[in-house]
């Protein structure tokens, strides 16, 4: 599934095509895995990293499980795949996506990144800090989601991004694009949701109590008590 990097000369070393998908993963579920595997195939990625956020400034803290539990659920869901679930944002000390991406680009110069988001996040993108700078850092792939696609195209973000949209049939060539560059991906809809899982099992995170985790990127151990009380 490795993508081909077209360089201008033999001295240009191929960088590893890597997707970045951020989120709370509260918890991670089969829908996350399905869209990620589809994106890996469509974009010819070597790997896709799940950036499990310590905390989303745009989401309420109520109902948010502790990071160790969310990361454990993500690592479990990513097994036997090119997906790597990481809590590297906690180690980087970043709160906003733009700061995380800047640090990842500097830390991993041998990787060529593409930011992956759902169409629902594209609707919210103008609320993100320095959102235009995110688009200037790396290409963006937007995954269509039922109920969001028409609104996503009409929102303020697309007023600026529309000029940078690339044809979907050229998606596998994203490593040749100079950002800003945006491509829309359409896969079979997946109705699974973290909200439904939490409603069916509000204490889902307790099954990860006491598990010690090693982050696949930082190699640091991440562990901590899983709160027994209200989340």
List PLM regions with ranges.
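Nucleotidyltransferase catalytic core that binds NTPs
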Residues: 1-231
């Amino acid at each position: 599934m490795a993508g081909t990097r077209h360089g201008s000369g033999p001295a240009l070393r191929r960088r590893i095509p890597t997707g970045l998908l951020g989120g709370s993963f509260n918890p991670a579920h089969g829908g996350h895995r399905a869209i990620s595997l589809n994106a890996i195939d469509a974009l010819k990625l070597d790997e896709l990293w799940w950036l499990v956020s310590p905390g989303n400034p745009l989401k309420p803290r109520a109902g948010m499980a502790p990071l160790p539990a969310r990361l454990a659920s993500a690592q479990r869901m990513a097994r036997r795949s090119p997906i790597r679930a990481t809590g590297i944002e906690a180690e980087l000390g970043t709160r906003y996506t733009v700061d995380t991406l800047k640090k990842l680009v500097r830390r991993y110069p041998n990787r060529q990144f593409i930011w992956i988001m759902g169409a629902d996040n594209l609707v919210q993108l103008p609320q993100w800090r320095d959102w235009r700078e995110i688009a200037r850092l790396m290409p963006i792939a937007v995954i269509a989601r039922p109920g969001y696609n028409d609104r996503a195209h009409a929102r303020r973000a697309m007023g600026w991004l529309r000029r940078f949209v690339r044809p979907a049939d050229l998606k596998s060539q994203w490593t040749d694009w100079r950002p800003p560059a945006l491509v829309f991906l359409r896969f079979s809809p997946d109705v699974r949701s973290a909200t439904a899982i939490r409603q069916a099992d509000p204490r889902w995170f307790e099954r990860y109590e006491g598990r010690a985790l090693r982050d696949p990127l930082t190699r640091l151990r991440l562990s901590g008590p899983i709160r027994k009380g209200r989340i």
